[in-house]
Amino acid sequence: RARALATKVVGYSPGDDAHVARTHGLLDEAAASVAEACAGADLIVLANPVPAMPEVFAQVASSAGEHALITDCASTKSSVIAAARSALGPAFERYVPGHPIAGSERSGPGAARADLFANRLWLLCPVDEAQRRLALRLAGLLTALGARVQTMDAEVHDALFAEFSHWPHALVFALSAAIASGEHAQLAAEFSGAGLRDTTRIGASSAQLWADIVLDNRDAVLECAARFEESLALVVGAIAAADRERLVEVFERGARWRRQVD
């Protein structure tokens, strides 16, 4: 909307988010249903929780125009693509699976920013030639939003995001819960420095949303969890044995990888 890429932006949400977004000038219109939101749309973007995808795809299939391009923003792809294939029918050939790598621990209209996608990755996961052609069209719009568009196989996507998003979120929630259950929880909240705040930032995200994501990609997440358990066992064992050399070895291995992120 801020970049004048659409003549009209219509949104729908089961709760009040669409109406709040309209009040804040983020939408031109808050629709009363999925069907109303899809009516006359050239582009339909689905940003609902993963468990709701099958039902929403079915509603879109019965209300989208025959030339409307459909995409989604789900954090998992394999199950969402399967749901789309089952529910969209002929409209599946006009669907491009997507995942913008943007956002924060905040959610809702209050977290909206015009520059949210600037210089951020937006992954597209087309499964056939028809979707690949549409992905090129969609990429033009996403690039105009400032995003850097790349394509990726859906199974590779889910394995990668289990590694550096889904499991890390589960781990940070668990760490935060462990601190919260300790006798010094309140003092930890009051006196914690930047290290703890940085480490646990994503633990302030929506618990319901992330439970759905982790369970939807549970096989890949469990593989990551098993590898973490091995690493944690090394750390705990080294601490218990007062083995500084082994502890430094594990810490250095982690530090070398972390430096690559920056």
Task: Give the positions of each predicted feature.
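NAD(P)-binding Rossmann-fold cofactor-contacting core
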Residues: 5-26
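Rossmann-like NAD(P)-binding element
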Residues: 34-69
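Internal alpha-helical scaffold of NAD(P)-dependent oxidoreductase catalytic cores
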Residues: 116-201
